[in-house]
Each structure stands twice: as structure tokens, then as C-alpha cells.
């Protein structure tokens, strides 16, 4: 089944839901970065979250960056989404290993760390991107994303994220959802949603049973006249190109480019998001340098 994102609202307009299925997306990330299970789960959750956050943008060429810097062995985790929910990402230590938790699950919270900062950067086409920061709440990512919405954007939010890694270290299933209360929602609605969230349980448990995220959303909001407003495919999609790398080299300035031409026979630039390698020989660099004089 292909990955997809849906967005909907209850009939009374009090609850918004965004849900995304990301199994193929997270597996593609694992193949690119050769992540071990702990890193697969951590970056997979982050990609799932930022996909939903990016889809909120009204600016077609906008992007959302979600960065988590904790004190755990995984190091910094960075994920970026466009306005359609297509993502890319990387983390500092894809080979980090920790013992499983007592319940047998991967210890993502310890991998990220309990102390640190979650940063959200929204590029919405204005002069300066919007940046919001909060302290990490648990390092489990879903709780931290929910806290970001509450503390930084004042939107009561429930976030659920899940990545199930198979015995061969491939991604068996992945997905998540954001449930958000709109202004004017009655107080009793919170209790109902908390009950529904607890009753549905983990995202991966539902996906492993053969459900998809559309069905999970319908179960969460059963009897509340869920109206889907949007549904489309999403994917792991890097935006890098040789032309963009050339622009980055030129932006380093004439002095630095002249130094590279003098000291290096060739240089290689590796994309952090997809591991694509772009190689430039002296003639390539000299041509780039000449182009800056025009």
C-alpha cells in the first residue's frame, strides 16, 4: 500500500485530524541512511510528524523543518517537509544502540535524550521564517510535538506516532496522527477524545492488524461525522540537485573557490538527506568561478 496523508474535520467543526501512513517513506529513509532500529524509529517518527506539520502550510512553496536536539546518543535529528507532506531528513548517529525498554520496545526517549530543545521552523514565503522552540518533554517525539502545539501555538493537541521495525530491520509499518481541538470546543470533548485515543491504542498495533490510517482516523472520530477535506500520496523526496550544489559553492565566495581550485584536484559534496554525491573537478570549479564575474 502506498503512503498517503488525509486531513479532515468533524461535522461540528470542533476537531481537526491529520493522519499519515508512512511505511514506504520510513523504509526509504532506512535504506538511504542505513539506520539501525533505534535510529529508524526516531527519525521515522520525526518524518511522520513533520509530514503532517508541512501539510498545514497554505504557502505552496513553503516548508517546515522539525529539529530535535537532545542529550542522547542519537544526536540531532532533522526532518523537513514541503507543503504537500513530502519529506526528507537525517540524524547524527544512525548506528546508535541502546537496550530495549522493559516492555520490549525501542527506547527512543533515551536515544533522543530527556534534556534538549525541539525547534520548528516554518518558511511561509515571508521575509523571515517563523521559529518556535520548546524544551523536550520526554524525547519520545509524539509527546514533544503535542507540547509544541500547546505551548507555542496554543492549540490543544494529541499526537501519536509509530514505527514498527521487523526482525530483518526493515520497516514493517509506520504512521501517525494529529488530533487538534478548535476554538469553542466543549470541555467534555477532551474527555471523549482521551477515551478514544486510549481505546484505539498504538498506531503500529492497528497498522499491523491490516488497518490503514484512514480507518484509524474513522475509529478515533466514530459517530462525529468525520468529513475528509484532503487525501493525497506522500513520499520521501529529496530536493537536491547539481545546480543547487553549484549555487552553494558560489555562495562560499571567490576567495574560498580560488583556494579549492589551487589545492584540490576535485571536490565531492554529499547530500545529507539522500547521500547523493556531486563531484566537481578543477575545470568545473574554474567555470563556476568565471560565471561569478558575469
Which residues fall in each region the model found?
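Interaction interfaces in information-processing and related assembly proteins
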Residues: 1-230
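Cys/His-clustered metal-coordination modules, chiefly Zn-binding fingers
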Residues: 198-294
